[in-house]
Amino acid sequence: MSNFETVLNALPDTINSEQEAAKLLTQFQPLRNMSFELKPDTIIFCDSKDLNTALEFYKGQEHCIRAFHVLGLKEEIKNKNVKIVPFTTFTKEDNIHCFFLPDLRPACTAYRNLSIALSKLNIQEYTIEAKSASKFYRRNSFIFINNMLQTAIDNYNALEDNLSRYTYLSLWKSRHLCNPNYIPIVPYDQYWHPLASAKENDLVCEGGPANGITTIDFCKKLRNKCDIIAFEPDPVYYTNAAATCKDYQNIRLIPKGLYDFTGTLYINTDNYVKVVKQKIKEEDFECSVTSIDDYFLNAKYDKVDFIKMDIEGAELNALMGAKQILQRDKPNLAICIYHNCIDFITIPEFLRKLDLGYKFYTGHHRPWYAETVIYATAR
């Protein structure tokens, strides 16, 4: 049994003290480690677009490599030095080593795809080519606040299952050590927790459709048996989302952001796009915002069934502006808790203290800090 499985299976339902939490955290080991050297019988796992680079990179080390498993490859490639096959499956006993080309952005598509493919096989532990990851991880750093441990413990005690509990504690440790490799990647799609997702015939409130890809995904997975109200304040994203969603009659795009009041704020684009109360630089521009309560109560919708938020750090404010809808309808929730460094503490705390009978789960969907979601259901 792996360290991950051993710790996962032994987690307590509740933690009673900061000392107990600290002791538990010592048991958590990195799930993904950077490595410069190949072990015997290694399987190189890479994306098809990176295959030629990987073959050149590992030239002369073929004696350590059992095979190249390639994501996106349709048929086996004959090679006199090493076996090259399409990715099909791995076992937890395999010595898997991920190779990808480093990306200057905080998100790396190839690495994301490799890690998600492994997570869907319930494989959390593998190595990463150090030269792939070193540039990538050097860009990650988070301010960390140590005096919130008791609140984090209270959030942990409200979670429903061990995978959520493990994920939550690993978030704490990863931010403390500035190393996201402690966080497991859950085996279900983002926003689609098996017990807290949108259902057919739901009215979906989507905060942050961006280019409309997630909006279309809701429609496809719900077989178009849903109505979606999507709020996007950025005019470029709004235009792109409108083009993406133009053939869907059940999608309504609103050119506003979600916040705790109805009025005007500013969009700041220094790093990630985010909504701010005051202009930070000359290029910042005004945007309209509304609260979920103001919009849905005034529009006289009978019920909001599901709320998804990925709104660049405005999630807590938007939830504060949704108290009446949360109390009236108790919609299923999928709320991002990673944009601000303490969102993973403050947002679960806010939802927990509403005391609406929600069951809570946490899911992490990428091999870095981003894309952590708290899921909730009161159904």
Segments predicted by a language model, with ranges:
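Phosphate/nucleotide-binding beta-alpha loop and adjacent structural elements of enzyme active sites
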Residues: 1-67, 71-379
